[in-house]
Amino acid sequence: MAKSEEARAPKRPMWTGSIAIGLVNVPVKLHTMVFDKGIHFRFLHKDDGQPLRYEKVCTKDNKVVPWESVVKGYETGKDRFVVFEKTELDAAKPESNQTIRLQMFVDYLSIDPIYLDRPYLLTPNKSDDAYSLLSTTLKKMGKAGIGRVTIRDKEYPVLIYPYKNALVLTTLRYPHEIADPGQLEELKDIKEPSSEELALAKKIVTDLSGEFDITDYRDSYQEKLTALIEKKIKGEPIVAEKPVQPEAKELMVALQETLKQLKKK
């Protein structure tokens, strides 16, 4: 039951609009680019092993509410709401609901990775002339465009850059969505390492330095989970083995022994 690791084709577009650069208009379609290939379990009723379903139940009369009777509301107080129709919510949609206006261009590597959220694939819509021009220009100059887009009732800052023969849009996180490490007590007043510790740590990093290749990495948890499922299907017993914890060592000793192990390779 192993799942194929072949690359998947993008699904149908989830957004259609255009990229605007001054008076230049680039018609595009936005596709999901990241897929969850993990194993998923369903919740079952323990007594009979049948799957559970979830329903929208009114908290007042405990009756199941059909989807056509569901509206959105904003809570103004305990059990007090103002109700919005879809047409009313549409009034709040900004220009970025249909147009990604690029406001500036930056070096792609100048963006702190902490702000990178989710990548989407941009494809040309109807005409590809302007799309090709933008993609080629960004690729030759090593630049990325900064703009905004509204997806599913939220406006995101975005980064648009070339990837292979396409353009990719990555949504960015707002500063207030990122935790401030300085607020954690554990990170306050951390002492500086000794010069000896730092020297050994630098040697370890140097010895382990190399070129990153994502294909070198596999999801070992999913592979083991697949093997367990196959055992379960065959009715074979499953025994959980506890991982062996490495012996705790004093920092300098651990650094020195790590260097020795690396030299043996």
What is the predicted function of each stretch?
Residues 1-265:
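Boundary segments of small protein-protein interaction reader/adaptor domains
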